[in-house]
């Protein structure tokens, strides 16, 4: 039976409820028959039924020994628990003063509050307002997995606390062992509502060595952005030497922020990188300005400017993309600061468009300004023709389909056909930037019209699409052509018929049930010959010869060139799809073009008299979950040799394990092999280790390209990663080709403190951009592993 309590004054109702629950649980245990499972009371960190909004939660105290005086105090000893809303307090002894709402707890005191846990020897706490003092506690924050210790923690309210002589880390606690990294501070303040921490007199230690000291250091308690200094950026390359920069992040408003990074390069001098981002109701964008005044190596100031903006007004949308740099060698010396995929050709592009859907079709109106900066350099052999600028481009495009009344009257072969058509009218003013080569033809004006009418027929397993299209253009040039003309025009009609089928059957492949398809396709094209040698070429370029382009009616992109094709493309694709998973397991394809007459308007300007084009073959396989492979081959049947080929294979047996190999060949141009990987090489992965240690595992990651033709490495990156669970170290070497005999070699070092920040150059981005299937080692851990704006 429960031990009788001393005779005291009547206790408050919550205390009596706790005592009654204790006695009821013990009585049930005594009365339960031996053959039945006894009912048990189980502890919980929160009350099962939360208080209603506006209601004050009940305060419940339970203990092995409990005494109470009504409306004055309650004293407990031996496994004491105090529950109040989201608060659960455990201690060896507890003295609760009712009037003051003050709890004094001693001996193995443990607080659980909103998922956070605090443990220490002595606590004084005003319960309802969660205000008090905890002596020499340790703590754990549930939102981030971070933990620490302090001499004293002052609870200001339920969302704010201040720790004297405190520490913070995301490494798991190990008895008698310092964490691999931690922040120690004279005073540590935490705003749990805003998810941010502030360390005054802070020192960041890594493996016991101080690596950063600051009068004040802010850090995140979640993935939300906040103002403050970020860990430094560290770079080392052969052109600029050692670079050290310290970013400051300014969280201006929820929809605006900025980052300023003063830096120093040992070879070049001092500079400043800046970025401003905004997200407004009508528009969003980013502005980057990078400055290097008085470059000691180059002899002049260097800069770059990047503008990105998207927005709209009414039915109209606009898009701005612009990148400019100070000089032709900027892309070599400051490659990290150039974003363009073509670093020697920088665009400034402003597009304005309107999309309007009507009952009979769609009208697209648009206007564009496009200018270029070409970084030619002094090497004449590496210089290239500059694309023409559009100043401006204005057009309208109408797309429509005939209504049902028209369709009912048009029934070839007894089937209803769907008439559709489009018309594009456009004006362009073309000119050349100042960096254009002297031999390039000057600009001019062009008006063109592109139109087509088609009558698609088909069913579930076939289609037949006859199509008539017209490409008409008129020119007014700034300088006369070779024949003396400045004004000229031409009209190019084209007839095409696209016909295909889809046949399916049940099949088996390597013992697996499959659904196999056979998809033959024919494309007939007839475009008459028009002499285009004396016409300007402002925007046309040859299309790559592949499975997509062979099924088009023009071998050129743009408007100015139209190939005089009279040809039939014949091909077929077969697919095997798993009936169980619905995934494509195998795909095989072949296609070839047959010419009915010689072709004179060609990509290389040489007439084509060969009746059969090169044969294109393609295959892709995913026969097993861990393996992927694909390849394409362009084969010349007349010479019996391959013209181009690409072979690729990838093996990914599990997380953080990927290996890919590629071979690329273009006859008389290039032959290259590529190896990319991410692979564990030593140690036990974090997911398989005990959580009581930060023991590590080594990984290797990288991509290496080797030119068999030139017998040298081209653009490559290779390095190692060490994952200790609560921190990740990455270091590697990146090699970029910047000319026929020039390279830029960069050493990268990055320390990622999981739950805090990344220290060093962004090796992570380099690996993600270069390694197919790369996965960040800490991706399954703290939500704020990257404290980067």
How should these model regions be labeled?
Residues 2-7, 30-31, 35-49, 55, ...:
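N-terminal targeting/secretion presequences
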Residues 17-21, 63-64, 497, 503:
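Short, Lys/Arg-rich amphipathic segments at extreme N-termini
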């Amino acid at each position: 039976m429960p031990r009788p309590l001393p005779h005291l004054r009547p206790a408050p109702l919550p205390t009596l409820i706790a005592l009654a629950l204790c006695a009821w649980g013990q009585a049930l245990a005594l009365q339960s028959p031996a053959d039945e499972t006894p009912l048990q009371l189980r502890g919980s960190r929160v009350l099962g039924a939360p208080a209603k909004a506006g209601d004050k939660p009940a305060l419940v105290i339970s203990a092995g020994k409990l005494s109470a005086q009504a409306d004055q105090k309650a004293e407990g000893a031996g496994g004491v628990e105090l529950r109040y809303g989201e608060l659960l307090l455990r201690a060896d002894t507890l003295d609760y003063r009712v009037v003051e709402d003050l709890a004094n707890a001693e001996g193995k005191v443990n607080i659980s509050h909103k998922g956070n846990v605090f443990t220490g020897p002595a606590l004084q706490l005003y319960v309802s307002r969660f205000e008090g003092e905890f002596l020499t506690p340790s703590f754990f924050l549930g939102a981030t997995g971070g933990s620490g210790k302090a001499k004293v923690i002052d609870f200001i309210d339920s969302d704010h606390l201040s720790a004297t002589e405190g520490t913070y880390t995301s490494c798991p606690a190990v008895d008698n062992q310092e964490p691999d990294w931690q922040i120690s501070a004279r005073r540590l303040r935490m705003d749990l509502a805003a998810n941010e921490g502030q360390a005054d007199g802070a020192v960041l230690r890594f493996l016991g060595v101080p690596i950063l000291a600051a009068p004040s250091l802010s850090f995140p308690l979640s993935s939300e952005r906040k103002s403050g200094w970020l860990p430094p950026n560290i770079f080392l390359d052969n052109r600029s030497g050692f670079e050290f920069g310290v970013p400051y992040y300014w969280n201006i408003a929820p929809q605006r922020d900025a980052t300023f990074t003063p830096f120093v390069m040992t070879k070049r001098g001092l500079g400043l990188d800046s970025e401003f981002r905004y997200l407004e109701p009508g528009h969003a964008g980013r502005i980057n300005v990078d400055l290097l005044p008085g470059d000691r190596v180059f002899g002049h100031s260097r800069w770059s400017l990047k503008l990105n903006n998207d927005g709209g007004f009414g039915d109209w949308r606009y898009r701005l993309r612009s990148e400019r740099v100070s000089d032709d060698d900027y892309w070599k010396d400051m490659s990290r600061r150039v974003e363009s995929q073509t670093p020697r050709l920088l665009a400034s592009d402003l597009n304005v468009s309107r999309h309007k859907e009507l009952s009979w079709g769609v009208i697209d109106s648009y206007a564009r300004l496009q200018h270029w900066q070409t970084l030619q350099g002094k090497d004449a052999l590496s210089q290239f023709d500059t694309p023409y600028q559009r100043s401006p481009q204005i057009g309208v495009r109408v797309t429509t389909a005939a209504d049902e009344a028209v369709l009912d009257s048009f029934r070839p072969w007894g089937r209803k056909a769907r008439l559709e058509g489009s018309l594009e009218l456009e004006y362009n003013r073309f000119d050349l930037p100042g960096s254009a080569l002297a031999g390039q033809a000057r600009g001019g004006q062009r008006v063109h019209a592109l139109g087509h009418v088609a009558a698609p027929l088909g069913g579930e397993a076939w289609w037949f699409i006859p199509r008539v299209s017209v490409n008409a253009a008129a020119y007014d040039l700034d300088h006369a052509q070779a024949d003396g003309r400045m004004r000229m025009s031409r009209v190019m009609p084209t007839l095409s018929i696209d016909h295909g089928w889809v046949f399916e059957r049940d099949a088996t492949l390597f013992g697996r049930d499959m659904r196999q398809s056979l998809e033959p396709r024919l494309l007939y094209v007839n475009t008459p010959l028009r002499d285009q040698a004396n016409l300007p070429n402002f925007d046309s370029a040859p299309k790559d010869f592949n499975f997509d382009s062979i099924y088009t009616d023009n071998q050129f992109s743009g408007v100015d060139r139209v190939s005089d094709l009279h040809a039939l493309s014949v091909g077929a694709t077969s697919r095997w799809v798993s009936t169980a998973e619905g995934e494509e397991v195998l795909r095989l394809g072949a296609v070839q073009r047959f010419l009915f007459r010689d072709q004179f308007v060609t990509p290389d300007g040489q007439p084509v008299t060969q009746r059969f084009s090169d044969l294109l073959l393609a295959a892709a396989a995913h026969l097993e979950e861990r393996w992927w492979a694909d390849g394409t081959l362009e084969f010349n049947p007349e010479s019996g040799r391959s013209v181009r080929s690409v072979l690729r294979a990838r093996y990914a047996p599990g997380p953080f394990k990927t290996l890919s190999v590629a071979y690329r060949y273009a006859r008389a141009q290039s032959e290259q092999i590529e190896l990319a990987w991410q692979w564990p090489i030593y140690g036990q992965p974090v997911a398989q280790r005990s959580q009581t240690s930060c023991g590590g595992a080594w990984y290797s990651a990288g991509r290496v390209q080797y030119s068999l033709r030139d017998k040298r490495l081209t653009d490559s990156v290779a390095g190692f990663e060490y994952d200790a669970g609560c921190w990740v170290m990455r270091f590697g070497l990146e090699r970029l080709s910047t000319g026929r005999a020039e390279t830029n070699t960069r050493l990268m070092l990055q320390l990622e403190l999981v739950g805090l920040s990344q220290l060093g150059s962004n090796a992570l981005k380099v690996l993600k951009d270069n390694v197919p299937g790369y996965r960040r080692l800490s991706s399954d851990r703290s939500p704020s592993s990257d404290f980067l704006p």
